[in-house]
């Protein structure tokens, strides 16, 4: 989705650490500079991120304080017909040459406050509520409920994950984490639903060996969509 900043935010958080320090990440999702939405460059966790200040990076700064954020100010130095990505590329080239952020922008104290979907925990720690923030090409549905939230709230007690009319009372360690025997082999479990915390530490609802175009997926078979609610009780 070219304008889904929440989905992009999850993908960035999940992917950036697979790149070496000092990598420059150009983010072209909903990148137009309009109104109070500035173009920004941010140094965070020794990586550089260039994008519009539209909420995409707000999840990152909740986890760690940025090293520096600047509002990009080089637009009047470029040709009048340049697009947003041309600006981002010019900034990236400057950084790649060892240039300082203050040369291409004015330092700002923080990102623009933007309302984003966040998971929540009830005061009595009886329930976690979250939403689907990403659906991958296999139709697996990733939520914004983290494993840390789960561990801190559930604390080893019995639980029930509820999403639409489907309930889970067990977490799988991997996609193939099913009990097998001489009677029931792993191949016989293809199409079974499962819930697990993915490699990025977020709760995911999936189907073993799903295929949205043939046998179906968690998204298609359960009718799940972006922003749908999931709860753990």
Positions of predicted regions on the chain:
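A conserved acidic, glycine/proline-rich C-terminal tail/linker
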Residues: 144-224
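Fold-independent oxyanion-binding glycine-rich loops
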Residues: 28-31, 45, 52-54, 72-75, ...
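A generic local secondary-structure boundary/capping motif
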Residues: 14-16, 38-40, 60, 79-80, ...
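Structural motif
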Residues: 23-26, 39-41, 47-50, 67-71, ...
């Amino acid at each position: 989705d070219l304008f889904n900043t929440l989905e992009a935010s999850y993908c960035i958080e999940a992917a950036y650490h697979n790149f070496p320090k000092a990598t420059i990440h150009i983010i072209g999702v909903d990148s137009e500079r309009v109104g109070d939405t500035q173009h920004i460059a941010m140094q965070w966790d020794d990586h550089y991120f260039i994008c519009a200040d539209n909420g995409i990076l707000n999840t990152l700064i909740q986890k760690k304080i940025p090293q520096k954020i600047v509002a990009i100010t080089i637009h009047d130095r470029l040709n009048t017909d340049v697009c947003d990505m041309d600006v981002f590329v010019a900034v990236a080239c400057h950084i790649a040459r060892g240039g300082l952020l203050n040369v291409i922008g004015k330092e700002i104290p923080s990102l623009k406050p933007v309302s984003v979907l966040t998971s929540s925990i009830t005061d009595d720690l009886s329930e976690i509520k979250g939403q689907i923030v990403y659906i991958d090409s296999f139709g697996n549905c990733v939520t914004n409920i983290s494993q840390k939230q789960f561990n801190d709230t559930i604390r080893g007690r019995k639980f029930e994950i509820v999403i639409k009319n489907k309930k889970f009372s067990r977490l799988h360690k991997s996609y193939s984490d099913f009990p097998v025997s001489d009677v029931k082999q792993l191949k016989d479990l293809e199409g079974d639903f499962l819930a697990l915390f993915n490699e990025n530490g977020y709760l995911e609802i999936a189907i073993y060996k799903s295929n949205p175009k043939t046998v179906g997926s968690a998204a298609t078979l359960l009718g799940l969509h972006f922003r749908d609610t999931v709860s753990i009780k």
